[in-house]
Amino acid sequence: MHRVVSLFAIVTCVAGIVSSAVAAPPEIRLWPQGMPEPVIPAAPPEKVEKSADGIQRRTNVSQPRLFVYEPPAGVKRTGAAVIVVPGGGFGVLADEHEGSDAAEWLAKNGIVGFQLAHRAPTNKHPSPNAGPAQDLQKAVIEVRRHAAEFKVDPQQVGILGFSAGGQVTLVAATNDRKFQSEEIAESHKPDFLLLLYAYQIYDPKTKGLRADILLDGGLPPTFIAQMGDDRGSLPQGSTLLYLELINRNIPAEIHIYEKGGHGFGMRSRPGATGPTDWQLRAIDWLRLRGYATAP
């Protein structure tokens, strides 16, 4: 009996180790030779915690990197890639329901998902989005550098930004490259964008978009989803962004739902259709452009 139990324990242990190894996605470090300022100290160490509200939060990120989620066996690759930028108010990264869950969802639809872990916290910096925007620009470059490895078309690299990640996405995409640390041939400009309740992109004082979103620099085709009752990211920002895009003849689509609040990511909300419906609309939008597999 003892021998059977011991054997069972060994098999279970080995299976757990193998399962854990398989579950861990590959990583791409963004700044192996050192990142530009502002630098996040290595201490305290990086921490990932899930609290009582069921939200996983990552913080103390001193080594920005990408986690790679490839389409599973049997799913046809489209050649597209999407970098997922979680929200978290620049203090933490909500990197499960606004990160890995989204990357896995994209992978199931034939898209290689790259989850960004940008430097954090930066919420006490003079410009909280500056470091994360550098990381995102470098992430786009690194995805193009690794295009052959992950069977990605370097001209089909998009970004999906949630909340603060949406703000970072717009700043990174509309500004010139924010670092000069090395010779770079690849462009940091994405080929398409998906924005979910982008955080504080509306300036109530000017009744316009925030000053560091430079739309005259150009944006690619953009999908926007927003909840009308969102008090964390006001719907005026998403609406104004959409109007600015169509006034510039940039292909854009927007979905505004009555209810759903803020920060739902890939999760449903009781009594609200928006938090799940946007996923269907986004996949339709991606399919029309050949970025996602047919149903």
Enumerate the language-model features and the residues they cover.
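Short beta-strand element of the alpha/beta-hydrolase
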Residues: 78-87
